[in-house]
Each structure stands twice: as C-alpha cells, then as structure tokens.
C-alpha cells in the first residue's frame, strides 16, 4: 500500500514508500517501471530527503496496521543513500514509537516526525540518529516544518516551496 513518493535529486527516479511491503519501491522516471526495491522496516510510511540531497529518510511506523494501541509499535527511521540506493543506517525509536509523517528542519540538522500512535513528536538528529521525544496531544498525524527556523505545525505534512 503506497504511502508517500519522492523524486531523486537528479529528477530521474521515484521512490515510493509501501507500508505493506515494508520498504521503498524504486521506479524509473522515464519508463515508469519498477527497477528496484529497498527493504527498510515494518510499515514504511513517510519519505524525507536530506537538505544536501545525499540521503532519503524513511519513517517506518513499526506496524502495518492503520491503528494500534499506544506503546505497541516498534518504529524506526532508515537512511537510504541516494547514490547507492542502499540503507546505510537505521535509527530505532527508543522504547518503541510510531514515526509517521513530518519533514527535515530548514538547516538540515533535525528530522521532525509525528508519533501518531504514541501521542508524541520525535526530533531526530540527522548526524547521530539521537531521538528526542516530545509529548503532544492525541494521535498527531503529520508535522509541517516551515522554512523559517523554529516554526512547526501539527496537523498534516505540507510540501512547502
């Protein structure tokens, strides 16, 4: 079940997160044919390119289900290197969690993700993978990161240009 799509920095390849396949389909932009698959983790959901265009962060919810009880999901973030199309790092959410949707900060230092099933938001250091958890209201689904540093909005992911 496709959940998110992003295009490679060179504009030639699509990356499609598939929640039921637990990974990312790689699709040629000219032929629209699948040319690969990258296993990332259970419930691959959101895709977020790094600001330098080297990496693609994949939010793996830790479950394939549409709804789960709080504390059940064991999510992670996979880091795919665009150049090799391989997972180069995986960052588990400590003590479980359900990374869902969000974006990268304007300075590229943090990946912000909603933790839909755990009533929290994750701030993940893109250099170390260190995760900070912030308790928020019930079932945050998406997180828009404004280009102006320090501005965030819970609700749903926005593509800001």
Residue map of PLM features:
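Predominantly soluble domains enriched in secretory-pathway, periplasmic, or organellar proteins
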Residues: 1-161
């Amino acid at each position: 079940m496709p959940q998110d799509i992003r295009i490679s920095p060179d504009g030639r390849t699509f990356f499609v997160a598939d929640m039921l396949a637990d990974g990312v389909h790689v699709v040629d932009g000219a032929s629209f044919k699948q040319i690969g698959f990258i296993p990332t983790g259970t419930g691959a959901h959101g895709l977020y390119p790094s600001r330098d265009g080297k990496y693609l962060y994949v939010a793996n919810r830790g479950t394939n289900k549409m709804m789960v009880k709080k504390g059940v999901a064991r999510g992670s973030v996979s880091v795919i290197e665009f150049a090799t199309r391989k997972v180069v790092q995986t960052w588990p959410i400590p003590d479980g969690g359900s990374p869902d949707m969000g974006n990268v900060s304007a300075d590229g230092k943090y990946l912000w993700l909603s933790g839909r099933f755990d009533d929290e938001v994750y701030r993940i250091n893109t250099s170390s993978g260190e995760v900070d958890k912030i308790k928020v209201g019930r079932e945050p689904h998406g997180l828009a990161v404004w280009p102006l540093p320090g501005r965030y909005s819970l609700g749903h992911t926005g593509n800001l240009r």
